[in-house]
Swiss-Prot record:
GO molecular function: 4-hydroxy-tetrahydrodipicolinate reductase; NAD binding; NADP binding; oxidoreductase activity, acting on CH or CH2 groups, NAD or NADP as acceptor
EC nos: 1.17.1.8
Cystine pairings recorded for this chain: none
Gene: dapB
Protein role: Catalyzes the conversion of 4-hydroxy-tetrahydrodipicolinate (HTPA) to tetrahydrodipicolinate.
Protein name from the UniProt record: 4-hydroxy-tetrahydrodipicolinate reductase
Catalytic activity field: (S)-2,3,4,5-tetrahydrodipicolinate + NAD(+) + H2O = (2S,4S)-4-hydroxy-2,3,4,5-tetrahydrodipicolinate + NADH + H(+); (S)-2,3,4,5-tetrahydrodipicolinate + NADP(+) + H2O = (2S,4S)-4-hydroxy-2,3,4,5-tetrahydrodipicolinate + NADPH + H(+)
Active site: H156 (proton donor/acceptor), K160 (proton donor)
Family label: Belongs to the DapB family.
Organism annotation: Bacillus licheniformis (strain ATCC 14580 / DSM 13 / JCM 2505 / CCUG 7422 / NBRC 12200 / NCIMB 9375 / NCTC 10341 / NRRL NRS-1264 / Gibson 46)
Binding sites annotated in the UniProt record for NAD(+): G12, P13, R14, G15, R16, M17, G100, T101, T102, A126, P127, N128, F129
InterPro entries: DapB_C (IPR022663), DapB_N (IPR000846), DapB_N_CS (IPR022664), DHDPR_bac (IPR023940), NAD(P)-bd_dom_sf (IPR036291)
Gene3D superfamilies: Dihydrodipicolinate Reductase, domain 2 (3.30.360.10), NAD(P)-binding Rossmann-like Domain (3.40.50.720)
């Protein structure tokens, strides 16, 4: 289903990502911001509590927001646990979720897949909304057909709660789909300090860096005989994610199943 104007509710509008999403919706002619979900400021106008031109009302109860504003889409940019809860509630109310939080397990995704099938509406969960990061993952999967030794180094700001990042895990998953699991490095290698070689997913080593001054960065490093290949993406501000959010909102109106990963809607 495609509508001329897409009515949107945003969860977490005052956060760093959420405030960018508010700007995106306000600046997009065929988007309409009809409500927001926040922990505080119940029933106040968004424009009264943050820099915004919107008169959309803030709700601390997500079900009240849905019943009173009837959004088509929920953009959720909160935390992993809240994001999981909001996604389920949205689907139960016939609202299509576009979710930028990570931490969804395979069982979580299976449950949500059943719910989208039952409701006949779409949902998009994306570990990363930056289109460049999505292309990095796709290019890395292509490269893994030719280079089987690979490690992933992801770097994020020091307020990020999960490690490794959802993008790193998704990248490793995509590489594993075309590469047999293998043990990398010397078979007798020993970690002098536990964890020095990073986390292990199907033989792929994942390394996480957390420092102030960073936003979101990832390098996928492949090694072969006499050569290396590095595929890197850097997000220098959170505006870099908004083109992917816009694409996801538009695409979620056209699908009737759960899509995990923005790479699955990029042709």
């Amino acid at each position: 289903m495609q509508k001329d104007t897409i009515k949107i509710a945003i969860a977490g509008p005052r956060g760093r990502m959420g405030s960018e999403a508010v700007k995106l919706v306000e600046d997009t002619a065929h988007f309409e911001l009809v409500g927001a979900i926040d922990r505080t400021y119940n029933r106040e106008k968004l424009s009264d509590v943050m820099t915004s031109s919107s008169d959309a009302v803030i709700y601390t109860d997500i079900t009240e927001c849905f019943s009173e504003t009837s959004p088509d889409v929920l953009i959720d940019l909160t935390t992993p646990e809240i994001g999981k809860l909001h996604t389920k509630i949205a689907l139960e109310h016939g609202v299509r979720p576009v979710v930028g939080t990570t931490g969804f397990s395979e069982s979580d995704l299976n449950e949500l897949m059943e719910l989208t099938d039952e409701k006949g509406i779409g949902a998009i969960i994306a570990p990363n909304f930056a289109l460049g990061a999505v292309l990095m993952m796709k290019f890395s999967q292509m490269a893994a057909n030719y280079f089987t030794d690979v490690e992933i180094i992801e770097q994020h700001h020091d307020q990020k709660l999960d490690a490794p990042s959802g993008t790193a895990l998704k990248t490793a998953e995509m590489i594993s789909a075309v590469r047999e699991a293998k043990t990398q490095g010397h078979p007798d290698e020993k970690e002098i300090l536990p964890g020095a070689r990073g986390a292990d997913q199907n033989g792929i080593r994942l390394h996480s860096v957390r420092l102030p001054g960073l936003i979101a960065h990832q390098e996928v490093m492949f090694g072969g005989d006499g050569q290396t290949l590095k595929i890197r993406h850097d997000s220098y501000n959170r505006a870099s994610f908004m083109s992917g959010v816009k694409l996801a909102v538009e695409q979620v109106m056209k699908i009737d199943q759960l899509v995990y990963g923005l790479e699955n809607i990029i042709e």
